Design a protein with these regions (language model features):
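Surface beta-strand/loop "capping" patches
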Residues: 179-209, 704-731, 738
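Beta-propeller domains with acidic blade repeats across secreted/periplasmic ectodomains
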Residues: 320-708, 712, 731
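Short, surface-exposed alpha-helix to beta-strand junction/turn motifs within ectodomains of secreted
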Residues: 723, 728-775, 800-806, 814-819
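Acidic, Ser/Thr/Gly/Pro-rich low-complexity segments and short DxT(G/T)-type signature motifs
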Residues: 337-339, 705-711, 730, 793, ...
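Extracytoplasmic electron-transfer domains, predominantly the class I c-type cytochrome c fold
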Residues: 1-40, 477
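Beta-strand-rich N-terminal accessory domains
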Residues: 42-209, 220-253
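N-terminal pre-domain segments of enzymes
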Residues: 41-86, 313-370, 375, 824-826
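Trp/Gly-enriched beta-strand surface patches
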Residues: 220-222, 226-307, 749, 762-763, ...
Length: 826
């Protein structure tokens, strides 16, 4: 067991360390293996009895009790809630009260007292956070219904609604939330009428208060504010001046009265839910329905209306009368906060600007790596798991974290000596992509594209705008939205996970119009597309990772309507994820006969978990400018690619820069001020990756101006391969066939996890083929060679190892991988 524990903790061979597991979970794995596999085969298996346990050595070390670090997400956190509601905003109300809104309906998902959210097993605390946010505390009985009516009722048909997406805009449109200090103002429309809503919990009284500003509209609105079901309930209205509990029955209610649902039908109350209104209440009407709902009707109006709904749930007559007393207090105070006055920002929440000093790499090569040091002491105990980055035109850097932050870094100069980090936003839903457009930060979240506004220009976001809501949001932890790319026309692109999701169409690339109003599926068939890129002509690239229906890691150059390999034929045994939430029978999914081939395949030891791509077009980045770069989340490496198009078929070769990042990198951008490449990423679920990667770093890959001998191009020709270099070759070594080692192989596309390497010459046989070179020619002025391979043909993978010399005698060793999709005709 001890050696197994060491393997799980530190890794061994091809198995990476399972750092995401707690010690208890590692012991659970060991116990499972012991009982399930070893027990039947081990004749001397020792049963776990009290006597056996008593005979074990005594532990004389005190195990420290670890306390959960308190994260500060600001006043609200976007997430899912449990495994049923995939997009919520949970608001801290104060006094350990919290409310969660379903952003697909703007109905309440839950309201409770006793804490915020249970997050210990999620990505906010664990590398591989497979748990989901749950209510931390006790749901408030009777107040779980805060629900808008549509089509004349609350039990409207849902068959034609998106199962994991927002309602039709004619019913509800969520616009975002504003922050003003600790206050949160929600902006949305219901049945065509604009609503501003600010939830709160009054000091000294355990009620939930909703301040509502309802815009004019021709349609009346209905809102269920409380609900208690059961036989023998009493329903009626309480005069706020009453000194005893006597519920009045009226054909038409008076808005100033309290609407009450209580038990039992007679005698002192044992439990109740009550609601009241305050403010501009003329024309508001209370009613009850057969399902125990207290319903507020807001009439059509030519004027806007500002009022509060106060909701309270307790057990006794005295507590109900205390609510009447609270209403009297409100009337004496005669003050009603106006949400519209809280939309442009309040006081700074995180005033501290943190200064760090970066580390410069030794400028002894053409390309070196610098490190932008992350803040050590951070406000809110932020876990700096960096997930994406983007630049402002002036060179300021936006960096987001997996936990939901955006930070702005200024003074990103050549020396990196005085980096200033300022927290700009927090509480977003698993950001994995960033863009800066016209000075505004756009964030790819799990449930939408969010656009951040700083109205009062204090360096913090005041409005988290829902720029484009995703129409299919899965509740499984692995269902990420990746990256954010922008074409010349202003369209935005991001990629959705394929496997381990409940999506109706898994593994899609989503194209969003410049105004955020139009969404379309650009292409499909990706398993875990953790990264994208975009070429100068507007075509997008997408990476993928080895797994089911994915033979190896790859990068694809995508076309509209393309299909790139992943087929949704898998389902979780407990149905935590299933095609279209289980609406599609995965057993009846018929895989296509083929798929669109990638630019490049890559074996696991070269890139086990691919990141995004970056087209570098700044000449200040030296000889590798003007080409496509690739990143590796699993290895923490940066690569450059050489593209070739033959008769409409695209293919590539790829070479790794010999620099080891300190973390897995999957997002890269060019700084417009210095022309250098910056990259970021994190670590987590990374079996087979490079060991020792950190949970987050930001690096600069800098061109120093020094010369580097480089392989600059590869071309597949009718009878061989041409290799070009940026230096003149030594003819003797360049024409020596022993200086080149070429191997080739294919992968098999199946529903199994990954693929072995298969012979091209003997299909079905596991193994690589040696590639014979029939001749070598120096091409042109000595900067290129042609390797004559008469039987060259399409193949998934070619591996070329070079061991050459330049004409000045300097050695040149390189490893390059190619994919051949097309060989030109003679």
């Amino acid at each position: 067991p001890y050696s197994m524990f060491q393997t799980l903790t530190k890794g061994n061979g091809l198995m990476g360390p399972q750092t995401w597991m707690t010690p208890q979970e590692r012991y659970d794995v060991i116990h499972y293996l012991r009982e399930k596999f070893m027990k039947p085969m081990h004749p001397k298996y020792q049963s776990l009895t009290d006597e056996y346990l008593a005979g074990l050595p005594k532990v004389n070390t005190v195990v420290p009790i670890t306390k959960q670090v308190g994260r500060d997400f600001g006043p609200a956190l976007a997430s899912q809630l449990g495994r049923d509601v995939s997009s919520v905003l949970t608001v801290k109300l104060g006094d350990a009260h919290s409310i969660s809104y379903n952003l697909h309906t703007m109905d309440q998902a839950a309201v409770w007292r006793g804490g915020f959210l249970k997050l210990r097993g999620t990505q906010h605390y664990r590398e591989r956070g497979e748990s989901v946010p749950e209510v931390e505390g006790d749901p408030i009985s009777g107040l779980q219904s805060w629900r808008w009516a549509h089509d004349g009722g609350f039990d409207y048909p849902t068959e034609d609604l998106l199962p994991r997406g927002p309602m039709p805009s004619k019913w509800m449109e969520y616009r975002g939330h504003h922050l003003h200090g600790a206050k949160v103002v929600l902006s949305y429309s219901i049945n065509g009428r604009d609503v501003l809503e600010m939830p709160s919990k009054p000091a000294g009284f355990r009620a939930i208060v909703h301040t509502l500003h309802i815009a004019p509209g021709k349609q009346s609105l209905q809102l269920s504010v409380a609900q208690l079901e059961g036989e023998g309930a009493r329903r009626g209205f309480l005069d706020p001046k009453a000194t005893t509990v006597k519920l009045l029955q009226a054909k038409k209610s008076v808005a100033e009265r309290l609407a009450v649902i209580g038990f039992p039908a007679k005698g002192p109350l044992e439990r109740f839910a009550a609601a009241a209104t305050f403010g501009e209440t003329d024309g508001l009407d209370w009613s009850f329905d057969g399902k125990g709902r207290a319903i507020l009707t807001i009439p059509a109006s030519k004027k806007a209306r500002l009022f509060q709904v106060i909701r309270y749930s307790a057990k006794t007559d005295a507590q109900l009368l205390s609510m009447a007393g609270y209403l009297g207090h409100l009337k004496l105070k005669n003050a009603l906060p106006h949400p519209a006055k809280l939309l442009l920002g309040g006081k700074v929440r995180w005033p501290k600007v943190i200064t760090t000093k970066g580390t410069l790499g030794k400028a002894d090569a053409a390309y070196v790596m610098d490190t932008l040091t992350l803040p050590a002491k951070k406000p809110g105990k932020v876990w700096f798991r960096t997930s994406a980055l983007a630049f402002f035109p002036d060179g300021r850097l936006a960096v987001c974290t997996h936990g939901g932050d955006v930070w702005i870094v200024s003074d990103v100069d050549e020396s990196l000596a005085n980096l200033k980090w300022k927290r700009f936003a927090a509480g977003m839903y698993e950001p994995f992509g960033l863009q800066v457009i016209d000075g505004l930060v756009y964030v790819t979240c799990k449930d939408r594209l969010t656009r951040l506004h700083d109205f009062n220009e204090d360096g913090e976001a005041d409005f988290y705008e829902s720029f484009s809501a995703d129409d299919d949001v899965s509740t499984f932890f692995h269902a990420f939205n990746f990256d954010l790319q922008r074409d010349a026309a202003g369209n935005l692109y991001y990629a959705k996970s394929g496997q381990y999701t409940s999506y109706a169409l898994a593994g899609s690339v989503i194209k969003v119009s410049p105004d955020g109003k139009k969404r379309e599926i650009h292409c499909t068939g990706f398993r875990t597309p953790n990264g994208m890129g975009i070429l100068p002509d507007g075509r997008v690239t997408v990476s993928d990772n080895q797994g089911s229906w994915m033979p190896a890691s790859k990068v694809s150059l995508c076309k509209p309507g393309g299909f790139y390999g992943y087929v949704q034929t898998h389902v979780h045994k407990q149905r935590l994820w299933a095609p279209d939430g289980g609406r599609i029978d995965h057993r009846k999914v018929v895989p296509p006969e083929t798929f669109d081939q990638p630019l490049i395949w890559m074996p696991q030891d070269f890139d086990n978990s691919s990141g995004g791509q970056l087209w570098v077009d700044d000449k200040r980045w030296g000889p590798l400018s003007g080409r496509l770069l690739h990143t590796s989340f699993g290895k923490g490496w940066l690569y450059y690619m050489m593209l070739q198009e033959i008769d409409g078929h695209d293919q590539a070769a790829i070479v790794r820069l010999k620099i080891d990042a300190l973390t897995g990198i999957h997002r890269a951008r060019v700084n417009p001020q210095d022309g250098q490449v910056y990259a970021t990423g994190l670590n987590g679920w990374n079996g087979g990756g490079r060991k020792g990667l950190s949970q987050g770093h930001v690096h600069r890959f800098r061109y120093t101006g020094k010369h580097a001998n480089l392989l600059t191009d590869t071309k597949i020709l009718a009878d061989g391969i041409e290799l070009k270099f940026n230096f003149k070759l030594d003819p003797k070594s360049a024409t020596d066939a022993s200086r080149y080692k070429l191997k080739q192989w294919n992968y098999k596309w199946t529903q199994g996890y990954g693929s072995k390497q298969y012979s091209l010459r003997n299909p079905g046989k596991i193994g690589q083929d040696e590639v014979d070179i029939q001749g070598i020619e120096i091409v042109g002025d000595g900067h290129a060679v042609f390797l004559k391979i008469p039987d060259i043909q399409p193949v998934h993978q070619v591996k070329i190892e070079l061991n050459l010399h330049a004409v000045d005698g300097s050695p040149f060793k390189e490893l390059v991988y190619l994919t051949i999709n097309k060989v030109p005709g003679p």
